[in-house]
């Protein structure tokens, strides 16, 4: 018998068996389920809620960073969990609703709308002005700048998903810009803000009137409680009589400077735990201090346990922690008492502001209810970009203090806004650019960490204000920048003098150069 004929059935059966095994065998490259705590690299495939995603940026997954929630980290690639050809997504998101405006100035407007929904996930929104695309954002708010005073504009918003599907335009909104701004402050368009020590810590002992003329705003540090737990604050000049100090303040004011009393500091624990006695002590004592010396306003520099959220206080829009509620009401009373020209600033640490992006509770985000409630009263917010370590930006990446990327990422969180306590949390709306300055140490000796060389800081400011990229890791969500961003705060004037004013000598000319550009001018 012919051997070829003899063994053909066996070969045919074996081949059929192999084909069957091949056909039903699971794919080796099937996407694994997404899991928090797993380190993912670029190109990794995962499945989440029966949808496949590809990692586009290396990271370690955290709860709240699910692929559908973080388009900066994951790209949707199709339906199904077991491989095969993905089903194309052709369904557009729903139309954005509830488009409203707020914080309208002569050159800018803040727009807010309700979130759209999508069968896979909304990745962003396009903002149109008079039919022209002017901004892209991944949040439900946008600050449109570069507008003309006294002009009416028509805005619409469209939602988009990862597949590029675009919703229909929202209902149009007409906004008319104002004819000018009334936010009080120095007449210069870019400010240098410094803290002056009312104590001797080995840096430099300076008479208040001898502060470098490079500074626009001088925060006298500090008014502190007269005893632990008291709501009464006190201030006594340490190197001058009361009359001499009043004369020094008047002298600086004659030069166009603003001189504020700063309350708190690292050692000044202020906790207004009751709405009657302590809050009244707080208001009365600050009214007396401000009136006695002729200060232009108040700087809030509360640290440590002075601001901390109680358990169960979960929404910055309606805080329940007594010492936070009482602080808000007390400051509002001071603003009302002294009137529209009262200058109000704040210098929180990053944990108390940007730290609320991922976690909201205890100290994390504890300043947010204060900033939110006072946003229409606040002249300037200069978060301390030092003594903080690394912080996470809007792109989900961690940035180290003392770098241009850190300054850009932290500033943009306030310029763009962010969800508090995770991607599903309530949205903290952005402040105006002219309400934002960057806080840095004046020298290596001034802080435990975060000192930034002048060239590095100016690199960050050129990107933030003019949109001039330095090729860093963080990418601005508004490529043109924020021309109205106000300037630089430093701790401190005394530490600057310790190094022969190297800090102010480097940054004053730089800020003057920025001031020649068109900005959202603040007139006092």
From Swiss-Prot:
Residues of the GH18 domain: 190-514
Limits of the Fibronectin type-III domain: 95-180
Protein EC: 3.2.1.14
CDD domains per record: ChiA1_BD, FN3, GH18_chitinase_D-like
Enzyme class: hydrolase
GO BP: chitin catabolic process; polysaccharide catabolic process
Official protein name in the record: Chitinase D
Classification via SUPFAM superfamilies: (Trans)glycosidases (SSF51445), Carbohydrate binding domain (SSF51055), Fibronectin type III (SSF49265)
Protein's organism: Niallia circulans (Bacillus circulans)
Gene this chain is encoded by: chiD
């Amino acid at each position: 018998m012919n051997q070829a004929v003899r063994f053909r059935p066996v070969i045919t059966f074996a081949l059929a068996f192999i084909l069957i095994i091949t056909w039903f065998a699971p794919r080796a490259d099937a996407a694994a389920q997404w899991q928090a705590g797993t380190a993912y690299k670029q190109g990794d495939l995962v499945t989440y809620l029966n949808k496949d995603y590809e990692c586009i940026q290396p990271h370690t997954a955290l709860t709240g960073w699910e692929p559908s929630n973080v388009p900066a980290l994951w790209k949707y690639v199709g339906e199904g969990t077991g491989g095969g050809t993905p089903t194309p997504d052709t369904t557009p998101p729903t139309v954005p609703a509830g488009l409203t405006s707020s914080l309208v100035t002569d050159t800018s407007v803040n727009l807010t709308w309700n979130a759209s929904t999508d069968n896979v996930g909304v990745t962003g929104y396009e903002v149109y002005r008079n039919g022209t695309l002017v901004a892209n954002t991944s949040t439900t708010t946008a600050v449109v700048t570069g507008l003309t005073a006294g002009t009416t504009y028509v805005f619409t918003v469209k939602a988009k998903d990862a597949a590029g599907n675009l919703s229909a335009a929202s209902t149009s909104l007409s906004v008319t810009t104002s004819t000018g701004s009334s936010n009080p402050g120095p007449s210069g368009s870019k400010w240098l803000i410094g803290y002056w020590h009312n104590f001797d810590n080995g840096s430099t002992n300076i008479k208040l009137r001898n502060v470098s003329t490079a500074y626009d705003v001088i925060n006298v540090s500090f008014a502190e409680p007269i005893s632990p737990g008291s709501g009464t604050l006190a201030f006594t000049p340490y190197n001058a009589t009361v009359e001499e100090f009043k004369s020094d303040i008047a002298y600086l004011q004659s030069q166009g400077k603003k001189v504020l009393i700063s309350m708190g500091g690292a050692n000044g624990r202020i906790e207004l735990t009751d709405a009657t006695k302590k809050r009244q002590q707080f208001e009365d004592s600050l009214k007396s201090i401000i009136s006695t010396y002729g200060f232009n306003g108040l700087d809030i520099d509360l640290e440590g346990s002075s601001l901390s959220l109680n358990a169960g206080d979960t929404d910055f829009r309606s805080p329940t922690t007594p010492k936070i509620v009482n602080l808000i009401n007390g400051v509002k009373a001071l603003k009302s008492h002294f009137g529209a020209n009262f200058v109000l600033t704040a210098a929180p640490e990053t944990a108390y502001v940007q730290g609320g992006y991922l976690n909201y509770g205890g100290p994390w985000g504890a300043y947010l209810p204060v900033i939110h409630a006072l946003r229409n009263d606040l002249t300037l917010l200069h978060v301390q970009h030092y003594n903080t370590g690394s912080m996470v930006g809007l792109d989900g990446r961690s940035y180290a203090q003392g770098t241009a990327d850190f300054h850009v990422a932290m500033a943009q969180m306030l310029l763009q806004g962010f969800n508090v306590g995770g991607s599903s949390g309530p949205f903290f709306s952005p402040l105006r650019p002219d309400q934002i300055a960057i806080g840095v140490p004046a020298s290596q000796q001034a802080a435990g960490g975060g000192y930034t060389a002048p060239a590095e800081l100016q690199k960050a400011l050129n990107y933030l204000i003019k949109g001039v990229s330095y090729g860093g890791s963080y990418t601005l969500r508004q490529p043109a920048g924020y021309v109205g961003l106000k300037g630089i705060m430093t701790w401190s004037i005394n530490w600057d003098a310790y190094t022969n004013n190297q800090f102010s000598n480097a940054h004053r000319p730089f800020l003057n150069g920025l001031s020649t550009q068109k900005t959202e001018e603040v007139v006092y």
